[in-house]
Amino acid sequence: MDLLNFLDDKITEEDTYTYSLTDVLKIRAEKEPKKTAYIFLKDGEDEEERITYGELYQSALTIAGKIRKNSKEGERALMLYPPGLEFVKALFGSFFANIIAVPVYPPRKNRSLNRIMSIVDDSEASLVLTTDYIHSSFHKNFSDIQSLKELYWIVTEGINAGPKFSGEIFNEDIALLQYTSGSTGTPKGVMVTHKNIMRGSEYIRQCFMHSRKSTSV
């Protein structure tokens, strides 16, 4: 059992039961800070932006600091983001902050808010993490919805400075709540632990024979 195994393609089953994604990001940021972690492809083809392990780690810690300034461990945060790296940074930020992420697609224009409101009620979310555009859009178009007004909104976009936070994370802790589409009824949430994510990632790595040199799309 060794965290460095994640850098040398020597990952053991025990490693995946012991460490979390935040542990892996931290060691990669320390040992390979300039290596690309994620690339966002606009329309699935053209590169729009990329982020290194070092940049992602620092962004996530700063976002976590902002989150914990306005929340407590174990609270649930609705995550309203379009596809892109802002979501990735906020997701890792929620992990480091020890809060439970609740990813939700933003509603399209003129589309009913019923699904989102159902998820807010079921998850008992108290926070919303989002971009400046979505934050402004919600408050412009849905300012009369009291339950949305009661949520604490945090715009993570552009958070580059401020206190950092890194909480203690255990593999059995809930990392996120994953909800069904709700197309055939009320959306139902599934609790996903940090261990679930690590084990699933390892299964994928083994199945596709990925190595530290692999690039996944």
Locate predicted features:
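Short hydrophobic alpha-helices that are characteristic scaffold elements of the AMP-binding
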Residues: F92-P103, D121-D122
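Acyl-group handling in specialized metabolite and lipid biosynthesis
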Residues: D9-Y17, D43-R50
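Short, well-ordered beta-strand segments
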Residues: E75-L80, F95, A175, T215-V217
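Conserved pre-ATP/AMP-binding loop-to-beta segment of ANL
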Residues: P33-T36, W153-I154, N160-Y179, G185-T186, ...
